[in-house]
Design a protein with these regions (language model features):
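Conserved histidines in hydrophobic membrane contexts and catalytic metal-binding motifs
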Residues: 1-353
């Protein structure tokens, strides 16, 4: 068996079994992506108006006091023109006067929780989570093999074969190859990042930054939001202060005596990865613990910071959510084509004999 025949066997047979899991992941991914798109398109009749530092300080003080369970307060931007307090699975939208405009909870969306965990672990707990991760890694390998196999026969295919003209196996097969080629790169990224999200130990350390004792940061007034935000903004005057986060409180865990807040910035309004620049500050002491821009991270840190955003579009533009949702739709279609052609050529052919 030569290399090409071996890769065809791997792509066909291993791909057939992986397809059964990937169809579940992709169809639920389309649903989750669609929900995210709808959320991001809602403006709640708010017009974007940048807040002053005084308004941001008032918002933080008020919202963290009124909603202690919330872990993040986000300020209006050109992309989301409203104030938002958020924690996992829930967010509250406010107008500029800090009046509640809307409450959004994932649990209120029909079937969201079920489909999310079906996407994450096939509703099978840790076993399903790791099964999903390895299926995603094998899916990434199958994608690379598919690119190689296309390269071997690239001269025999035409752009017009992308859309099948009938339901014959040959037409579906050619469409599978062409469509697969077009989405191969983003599909590979989705598969690989899905694997890495489960195996965080492979990359999480690259995100951790150690405070540099050689850098002396300006001090702020203890327990004074306005003074501390002013200090942080003066450190990066050309950046936009967009969010404040605190560590999420875990049920049953003792509350920390001192909270270090993460003050997050966008380097410019059109930045690809939002909230990527961060200053960590002790609110009680007014002392900056660390300050790190995404552009100052080593290459490993820059790559690691994109692992989750590339998979679920966290802090990424709306256009990226649309892209990966569309990729999931196309991938679902080509996997269905592959199931039909594989069944016809393998099992139906044997039954005729």
């Amino acid at each position: 068996m030569n290399l090409v025949h071996g890769l065809k066997w791997f792509h066909n047979w291993v791909g057939f079994f992986i397809t059964l899991t990937m169809l579940t992941v992709l169809t639920t991914g389309v649903y989750l992506g669609s929900v995210d798109i709808i959320k991001r398109m809602q403006t709640y009749d708010q017009q974007y108006s940048p807040l002053t530092l005084e308004q941001k300080a008032q918002a933080i003080d008020s919202l963290f006091s009124r909603y202690p369970e919330m872990s993040t307060v986000r300020f209006p931007t050109e992309h989301t023109p409203y104030i938002q307090a958020a924690t996992r699975g829930k967010s509250i939208v406010f107008d500029s006067q800090l009046n509640e405009v809307a409450v959004r909870q994932n649990s209120d969306i029909p079937m969201y929780g079920t489909l999310f965990w079906l996407h994450r672990n096939f509703l099978m707990g840790d076993f399903g989570k790791y099964l999903n991760a390895w299926a995603s890694l094998i899916g990434a390998a199958i994608t690379l093999v598919g690119i190689y196999l296309w390269w071997q026969v690239r001269k025999g295919f035409r752009l017009k074969q992308t859309i099948p003209t009938n339901t014959r196996s040959s037409s579906l097969f050619k469409s599978h190859i062409q469509l697969g080629l077009f989405i191969s790169v983003p599909l590979f990224i989705l598969c690989l990042s899905g694997y890495l999200i489960t195996y965080k130990g492979l990359w999480l350390d690259a995100l951790k930054s150690q405070p540099n004792s050689q850098i002396s940061y300006p001090a702020s007034q203890p327990s004074d939001w306005l003074n501390q935000l002013t200090t942080a903004q003066n450190l990066w005057p050309d950046s936009q202060l967009v969010a404040i986060s605190k560590p999420r409180s875990r049920p049953g865990a003792e509350s920390a005596a001192e909270l270090n807040y993460s003050i997050r910035f966008d380097s410019h309004p059109g930045v690809w990865l939002r909230e990527a620049d961060s200053i960590t500050m002790s609110y009680e002491q007014g002392v900056i613990q660390s300050a790190l821009k995404h552009s100052d991270r080593p290459l490993s840190g820059k790559v690691a910071s994109f692992v989750r955003p590339l998979h679920d579009a966290l802090n990424m533009p709306l256009s990226y959510v649309v892209l990966i949702t569309l990729v999931s739709v196309i991938a679902t279609i080509i996997l269905l084509f592959s199931l039909v052609t594989f069944y016809r050529r393998t099992f139906k052919k044997k039954s005729r004999k």
